[in-house]
From Swiss-Prot:
Encoding gene (name): IL6
A Pfam family hit: IL6
Positions carrying Phosphoserine: 81
PANTHER family: INTERLEUKIN-6 (PTHR48494:SF1)
Gene Ontology MF term list: cytokine activity; growth factor activity; identical protein binding; interleukin-6 receptor binding
Identification of the protein by name: Interleukin-6
């Protein structure tokens, strides 16, 4: 027991991975008379500081909302824009039924892996956003940095190694980005913001039940 206590309070214990181990090794006693569902839930590795994670995602969503509003006012890129064709070429991550993030077929491990890989895939799009956004640069930078930080928090919580995006896909996107005119840049930025917003909103709902 002493060796476990010593390792738990080493500097490395501040990582999310060891926090999860500590949470499993030292479960909080539940109320008397709890049902089997509560017992099963308590045995799953919980998200570390779930409330803080939710607040962090809401912070990013607030920045996205501000950028979308600015895009709508300055460049008329609003929710009713017809941009489906451009979206098909961007390979923007989405959460689908098979990702097991929806309540009807929820699976924590599968969902957490997909959220993490999705945020990883968004990185090239958010670098583009930061480099090309012509409005509030601080908000654009905040969305990029905050999403990257969220990814860093989630990565060690996965039981399996999270794969990196295919370099061929990244190269194709880079070529597409370089060929865009100003109008198409605005369309692309709007689509990135909208897709990231949807992805984070679904992720937020999933994290609430983890």
């Amino acid at each position: 027991m002493n060796s476990l206590s010593t390792s738990a309070f080493s500097p490395v214990a501040f990582s999310l991975g060891l926090l999860l181990v500590m949470a499993t090794a030292f479960p909080t006693p539940g109320p008397l008379g709890g049902d089997s569902k509560d017992d099963a839930t308590s045995n799953r590795p919980p998200l570390t500081s779930a409330d803080k994670m939710e607040d962090f995602i809401r912070f990013i969503l607030g920045k996205i909302s501000a950028l979308k509003k600015e895009m709508c006012e300055k460049y008329n890129k609003c929710e009713d824009s017809k941009e489906a064709l451009a979206e098909n070429n961007l390979n923007l991550p989405k959460l689908a039924e098979e990702d097991k993030c929806f309540q009807s077929q929820f699976n924590q491990e599968t969902c957490l892996t997909r959220i993490t890989t999705g945020l990883q895939e968004f990185q090239i799009h958010l670098k583009y956003l930061e480099a090309n956004y012509e409005g509030n640069k601080n908000n654009a930078h905040s969305v990029y940095i905050s999403t990257k930080h969220l990814l860093q928090k989630l990565r060690p919580m996965n039981r399996v190694e999270v794969t990196t995006p295919d370099p061929t896909t990244d190269s194709s996107l880079q070529a597409l980005f370089k060929s865009q005119d100003k109008w198409l840049k605005h369309v692309t930025i709007h689509l990135i913001l909208r897709s990231l917003e949807d992805f984070l909103q679904f992720s937020l709902r999933a994290i609430r039940i983890m």
